[in-house]
UniProtKB/Swiss-Prot annotation:
This is Malate dehydrogenase. The keyword Acetylation does not apply. HAMAP family: Malate_dehydrog_3 (MF_00487). Pfam families: Ldh_1_C, Ldh_1_N. The active site is at 180 (proton acceptor). It catalyses: (S)-malate + NAD(+) = oxaloacetate + NADH + H(+). The keyword Cell membrane does not apply. Keywords: NAD, Oxidoreductase, Phosphoprotein, Tricarboxylic acid cycle. The modification Phosphoserine is found at residue 149.
Amino acid sequence: MAIKRRKISVIGSGFTGATTALMVAQKELGDVVLLDIPNMEGPTKGKALDMLESTPVQGVDSTITGTSSYEDTKDSDVVVITAGIARKPGMSRDDLVATNAKIMKSVTKEVVKYSPNSYIIVLTNPADAMTYTVYKESGFPKNRVIGQSGVLDTARFRTFVAQELNVSVEDVTGFVLGGHGDDMVPLIRYSAAGGVPLTKLIAPERIEEIVERTRKGGGEIVGLLGNGSAYYAPAASLTQMVEAILKDKKRIIPTIAYLEGEYGQHDLYLGVPTILGGDGIEKVIELDLTEEEKAQLDKSVQSVRNVMAALPAE
Ligand SMILES: NC(=O)C1=CN([C@@H]2O[C@H](COP(=O)(O)OP(=O)(O)OC[C@H]3O[C@@H](n4cnc5c(N)ncnc54)[C@H](O)[C@@H]3O)[C@@H](O)[C@H]2O)C=CC1
Ligand SMILES: O=C([O-])CC(=O)C(=O)O
């Protein structure tokens, strides 16, 4: 049988969705379908066509199609969900929960109907609770429903550390644990530059400032943009996750994963280090935590559980 290109559908053609579609196509990961609600069909088709017309210049053979019909997403290998509302200055991600939970449910029904074997990656905020909502609604196994927070949060941390040390971002590694909120837990003990622990390179007070900036990294961009939230780094993060799955790379990266006892948590989606490969989340990696790290993680878990308690009833 002829080998076919992979198919990636991106639901929501706003800032994050459109940017993800472009980045995924530029990496030639497969053919991309960009979907939004019927009211947005014109702009969605327009963005997709504009991106498609960039492919000859870029030298990539990925198609990009804009649509408002789920028929066009049929048999996707990976579906990325970015549909929903974004926060504005003065709002927290948690303020989006009621509206976006409804959107997650309706989107998931269609994704399951048309792409029953897909891997779903959820970006929509509040991301931990929205990934949980999609998991429950889909009935998919836990490895096939994955949320995005840690690649982005870690990328922000790595950016700030590289700036501080004036070294390549490539050589800085880090791990951010916990919910995608201001209580997230950047794990300094597991962070390094060129393999050298950060604690040997940066003074504790500066590390604390970098941690604080990372925690509030989303809010910093919201404040600067004035009318929406970050999209370039989020799209790059989603693209890395799509690539890890489609190329079965078995990347060790933090994702929002379903926990059944790991880190002492049950029935919860939370940001943790995972192995992401051809079967989605192939493993949750459990790190040893100090008492202080555990306390920080517990605080973050409590914040996620508070948001989950605000999820609309079935
Ligand atoms: N987890 C993370 O790290 C990040 C999460 N986000 C979240 O991603 C979401 C999207 O952000 P942006 O793209 O900037 O927002 P945006 O407002 O630019 O785009 C959202 C799009 O979703 C569409 N949409 C709404 N309901 C829909 C439905 N039922 N079906 C299909 N499409 C629908 C809208 O028409 C709009 O085009 C927000 O909730 C934001 O908070 C954004 C950045 C990072
Ligand atoms: O801050 C927001 O609302 C969007 C987001 O999750 C991020 O950029 O980390």
